[in-house]
């Protein structure tokens, strides 16, 4: 057996390598803590984004507040920060575009309380997101899954069968005065402006036209002088057709501006857009 003796130079190189690895580990830990901290703070503060949209169908100013992807979060005790800000803005209409609840939460009382308070501020509409669907439907709302559940095919499909499914969240929301739109529309008059709002339940591109197409066409092509607002959670179906296919104003959520966000860089990954997606921004 041969013995090996490390030279002084080799020992020095090993010490340098160990020091480098230890330093690298500390840097990675520090970066991870910074990212987690920034995301934690960001998830407990909301940022407002204002958009101005013009339409010849509007006779007076209409202020709409869109709230999306809260995931059962509270901004201050009993959501006081969010409530106070919404009240101060004095909206004419409030639209919740899904994932206000969190499928892992034990209770939706916080969401119901928020919606009840804001229903006294302005007429409110609620559209289901994937978290609501996960909680109250036993299948993903794709065409394949829905057809299999109901025994449908292209020749016998009855979209209204899906709408016959009721759930506790809808009952509680509507008891507060919030209207839940599931592949249906409603009309509201704000000042002298008539507004039609359509809420999409089957936002998956595979099931949108087969389960919402008939009611959506009726919404789009009746009362054409009314302002048309289409509200949806997952926006992918909007990319399937030209913007003028969806009405005068489109409201969506879901992407959060990135599932993981790096400070100063932005979204690292979204489950729809992959790594370093072009999509970004604040949706709440």
Question: Positions of the model-derived regions?
Answer:
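N-terminal membrane-anchoring alpha-helices
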Residues: 1-58
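Conserved beta-sheet core of the metallophosphoesterase superfamily
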Residues: 235-284
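Short acidic-hydrophobic surface loop/beta-edge motif
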Residues: 49-55, 184-191, 281-284
